[in-house]
Each structure stands twice: as C-alpha cells, then as structure tokens.
Amino acid sequence: MVSTHAVVAGETLSALALRFYGDAELYRLIAAASGIADPDVVNVGQRLIMPDFTRYTVVAGDTLSALALRFYGDAELNWLIAAASGIADPDVVNVGQRLIMPDFTRYTVVAGDTLSALAARFYGDASLYPLIAAVNGIADPGVIDVGQVLVIFIGRSDGFGLRIVDRNENDPRLWYYRFQTSAIGWNPGVNVLLPDDYRTSGRTYPVLYLFHGGGTDQDFRTFDFLGIRDLTAGKPIIIVMPDGGHAGWYSNPVSSFVGPRNWETFHIAQLLPWIEANFRTYAEYDGRAVAGFSMGGFGALKYAAKYYGHFASASSHSGPASLRRDFGLVVHWANLSSAVLDLGGGTVYGAPLWDQARVSADNPVERIDSYRNKRIFLVAGTSPDPANWFDSVNETQVLAGQREFRERLSNAGIPHESHEVPGGHVFRPDMFRLDLDGIVARLRPASIGAAAERAD
C-alpha cells in the first residue's frame, strides 16, 4: 500500500522528499500525487501521498505523450509526468533528460463506489478522499460516475514483518525487492513478475508463488535465468519468486546454528500478505497457486496441504512427494543438505532422531485429504543420466515418490494431472507452459472493478 504522511510543524516538501526518497528534488512528485498546486505551501496536519516512481532517461524520438501512452496506456496523462519532473512545457523534452514517472493505477469506477471507499481501499484511510478528488479534477467529491477512470497513486511499503532494504522497479515487468526480516538471518530477495498490462489495465490478477530448487546456484533469480519472462508473456497472472535458501526446504528447521532460517514463516506469514497488500491480487483461495522445481516442488505440495485454504492449485516439477520411502531417503537428504549449506550443522527435521510429527505434517503422501478440491499437477523424469549419480538418485526417488503419491490420490478419488517424461532432474519449459495454462484456467480470472477485493 502506498505510504502517506501527516505534515508536522517545520516540515517542507523538499525535506520530506529527502527523508522518504533521499532526493530533495522529488518534492514535485509528492506535490503531484497530493494535489498540491504550490509546493512551497503545506499546512500542519495536511495529509500527503508518497508514491513509488520510476526514473526514465529520454532518448531520441521520445515525447511525454508517447511515454504516457507506453507507461500508463493514456497519452493524456503526460501532464503527470511533467508535474512530477518539473517540466513547464510538456511538449519539450531533451535527449538525456531524466524524468520521474509516478507509479499509479487507472481505476474504473463501478456501481457503488465512492471516493471515501476508494481512499480506504487504496490509501488505507477513507479521509484521504480529497487527495483523489484533487488529482482527478473532481469538483464535488460526492459525485463520481460509473465508468469514470481515476488516477490513484500506488507504492510498495514495509509491513507484515518485512522492511524493504533494496528494490528495483525499473523493468516493465520484473520488479525486485530485498527484505530485512526477523524470520531469516540475512536479507532474502524476491522477484515479482507482472503481466504485460499491469501498469495500464487497472485489473486485479491471480498470483502464482513459484519456488526454486536446492543448491548453491539457486535463489530468487533462478527462474529469470530459465526464461520465465518469455514463458509467461501474455499471461494474466502475477508470478512471485522468492528466495528459499540453498537448502531451506521451505521449512522452519528443528535447529540452526547460524541464526533464524524460518522460510515457512517468511513465505506464508510475511511475504504472502505483503504481496496482497502491495499488488492488485485476489486475497482468496481461488486467487492463488503454488508451484516449484525440485526442492521447490516439494515446498509447493507441502504448503498446499498444510495451508489448505491458501492455494487452489499446486504443481511439483520433479519435486519429491514421499518423505519416508526407502528408509526416509528424502528426510536424510533434507537434513544433510540443510546442515551443510544453510544451518551450520542444524537440521530441518532433527538428527539423529527425527521430529516425527513434523515429518508427517510435511509429507504429501500422509496429507492426501488435504489435496481435495485442488488442481494437482505433477512432472517426473523417467530416464536420468546413469553416469550422474546426483541426477540418477534424485529423479529416481522423485519418480517413485510421485507414483506413490498419485496412487494414493487415485485411491482417494482425488483428480490430478501427471506427466512422466524422458530425461532426468531438470526444469522442463514445455511442461511449465502446459502447467501455467492449467493454473490460469483454474484460478479466478483477472478483472476490473468490484471484483478486485484487494489492491495497491
């Protein structure tokens, strides 16, 4: 949700811009978002909007109208770029000039809307409705028309135990955040991949939480390296790709000797509500899916069962689904890998004695009833490389565990989609495309207006 501020004695817009953005020149952005005609005059108690923004460098051929059309879908919003950037004549920009592109959504009024209700929804305070009226040139805040398009400023802010310590929202689709959180002893990163039309559509979207696998080369950037932008082009869904540790196993571990590594808390109790408070997503069962590769595929199945009301679809791409088979091979691997890579000798499930209740709570084959009324999608390889012990052991175990899981689902009368395909322990883009189509079909479709239950 966008940040707001109430002016106190002695404050100026320049001083506030320096405090909030680290740049006093951004006072114009605050003025534009808050409907202030004279930036030199603010009053004690006056409420201000502190929106997010993107810096843009003008290239040959650019005009403010063309940039407004590209960023916002409406050329006539060039005046907002001009106001935020301190440009007196919107028809004149120079190559190399740095522009401030305010971050806002275009909201289409539906029956029953009021400015005070929209202020409560977007700004967290119904009394801020005059700011929406001022920016949109509405003389009578008590009168708005169905179909009227409003400019409403947005932004990402701290909350739910997360403090933003780094961010980059300059890419048209892929936005990056890094958080400080007491759940993790270091600052985990998250990539959020937006639909092509997120900036301009005003729609609310379903969301997919996509989890990476284990290993020292795996983190929140993994799927970007694997081509996730192309794989999701044109799809009306938000993709959230968080850090999960090199061997975090999407769990709060039994023990850690390097500080907190509570990935389950970070993902479920902190990141999920933060996403829903800061992006236009559906905060409901039918608005969320979870998927992952390898360790992340296990995490997807685990979260879908353990947090039954959170996710309507769960997908495991070469992820283990049975923890206890073959004398608990997956549990032993989770304990060993987490001890070496993440926990300084601590373990996810306990060693030498396991926390048996925790294993059962996390074990997909022991949680079969928790997959009812969900879309389940499974992928496993049938021909791992025999010369590569890691590939062979991994995918052989994955295949056997998924077969056990599928049999139990079938015996319980729970529908599921499964694919056994040639190859070993690798991410398969063609299977992800197929999966994504099914996810989009299962979840609540993107929509505008009253259907949007949560927004920026």
From Swiss-Prot:
Enzymatic class: hydrolase
Field pH dependence: Optimum pH is 9.0.
E.C. code: 3.1.1.-
GO CC terms of this entry: extracellular region
Family annotation (Gene3D superfamilies): alpha/beta hydrolase, LysM domain
Swiss-Prot/TrEMBL induction comment: Expression is up-regulated under nutrient depletion condition.
UniProt key word Repeat: yes
Outcome, altering residue 391 to A: 85% reduction of activity
Domain (LysM) ranges: 3-50, 54-101, 105-152
GO molecular function terms listed in the Swiss-Prot or TrEMBL record: acetylesterase activity; acyltransferase activity, transferring groups other than amino-acyl groups
Function: Exhibits lipolytic activity with medium chain length esters as optimum substrates. In vitro, pNP-caprylate (C8) is the optimum substrate followed by pNP-capricate (C10). May modulate the cell wall lipids to favor the survival of bacteria under stress conditions.
Name of the molecule in the record: Esterase Rv1288
Species, as recorded: Mycobacterium tuberculosis (strain ATCC 25618 / H37Rv)
